[in-house]
Every structure is written in C-alpha cells, then in structure tokens.
Amino acid sequence: MIQAEISIYPMATKTTNASFYIAKAIESIKNIENLRYEINSMGTILESDDMDIINKASKSMIETVHHLGINRVEVIIKID
C-alpha cells in the first residue's frame, strides 16, 4: 500500500480563503478507481496499491486549481 500526503496552496488568489480551490481539487479525485483518500487539516492523504494512481490524483488536483485561474500553486507531496 502506497501512502502520500498532498498539500496544495493556491498563490495570488483574490481572497485569503483557499477552501474553494481545495474543495474543487478534492472533488476532482472522487471518481478515481482504486484510490482511497482522507482529508485532514494539513492536506489530503492518498492511498493506493499503484503509484500511477497516486500520480494521477496529484496531477488532477493541481490541474484543477490551475483551471480555476490560479497560475501559481505551491504543492508539497510526501510519499511513503
């Protein structure tokens, strides 16, 4: 089982509240098969037996924030 923690920080938003962007990023991974995730205050825990699925979920989350008009996104990913 592969576990990863991803923390996404939208930069240069019109508001200091990033919850809208984070919620949309999490929504983007809800239908990825063979992926389990858990939300906590510091990020989102991703779990899968396949590293490609972890990568797909991470990419989806980051691209979702970009598609919402945020050009700069700071991302921290820890993988175990």
Regions found by a protein language model. Name each.
Residues M1-D80:
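Charge-rich, low-complexity N-terminal segments
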